[in-house]
Design a protein with these regions (language model features):
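An acidic/histidine-cluster motif and surrounding catalytic segment
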Residues: 2-92, 96-260
Length: 260
């Protein structure tokens, strides 16, 4: 299986944005040209490398890997194995694009991970948000994994889970969603969704429903749609946070009405 992957050093930095991240791994496919070598992406950590995947069709992998979904899960597993000697690691998928270039956001996250325990910090994910504080939202489940900071312990834990599940299932929904993911309050590094083979295998709803959802959110063909998508996620979080107060107010008003 090790023959299915190769590695290439693409950048080193003496002054990275994240002082508390040891390595950035960009997951890509052989002959892919999707990754945009944005200077910010190449300066996230001290070292940035490609993990180049030949793919399950061209290289023998475990028998359960029969779709791009499982192939991507296996690629994450392999990246975690490669990074065993490192502490905090950033994993980028090769369609990751920078949305927000304001350096202060990245510095805030770096300061946080330098003084706090964490599992996964996302720089661009969606889901059912719950506000944690002014800096982060929690989300369960989560969707989209194109830019994640993952602690060493969490990578080890997810590897075990991937082995137990034989690499079956989506990385975000099956493996990351159970890890108390923190999502930064602004989308920083995002992806533009297109009709890839992996998209064709999205689960949880019919394909037409996924297409409709990302169209409503504005995530197709324009990365600026992520601001709208975050607003939707944040608004739903506010509704859930205050729903008990709203319900109590309704009950109180009904009580007053019935007393008349």
């Amino acid at each position: 299986m090790t023959n299915c992957y190769s590695y290439k050093n693409i950048a080193e930095s003496q002054n990275p944005l994240f002082k508390n991240v040891d390595l950035t791994i960009v997951l890509t496919m052989k002959d892919s040209v999707r990754f945009k070598k944005d200077p910010l992406l190449l300066n996230l950590s001290k070292k940035t490398i490609f993990q180049i995947n030949k793919g399950y069709k061209a290289c023998k992998k475990p028998d359960t890997i029969k779709r791009t979904v499982e192939d991507l899960t296996h690629a994450y597993y392999t990246a975690f194995e490669y990074s065993k000697k490192y502490n905090n690691v950033i994993i980028l998928e090769d369609d990751a694009e920078v949305l927000n270039y304001e350096v202060s956001h990245y510095k805030k996250i770096d300061s946080y991970i330098g003084s706090n325990d964490f599992t996964i910090i996302s720089m661009g994910s969606l889901g059912f948000f719950t506000k944690r504080d002014e800096m982060f939202y929690e989300t369960h489940p989560m969707a989209h994994t194109q830019a994640q900071i993952i602690s060493k312990k969490t990578r080890d834990d997810i590897q075990k889970l991937m082995l137990n599940k034989k690499f079956m299932g989506h990385v975000d929904a099956v493996y990351f969603s159970e890890q108390n993911v923190l999502v930064y309050h602004e989308p920083l590094i995002v992806q533009v969704l297109s009709e890839t083979e992996n998209f064709q295998n999205w689960e949880g709803a019919p394909l037409w429903a996924h297409r409709l959802t990302i169209s409503i959110q504005g995530l197709r063909d324009d990365k600026m749609g992520w601001y709208k998508a975050y607003l939707i996620c944040k608004s739903s979080a506010e509704i859930r946070e205050y729903k008990l107060n709203i319900l109590s107010l309704i009950v109180f008003l009904l009580f007053l009405y019935c007393k008349k």
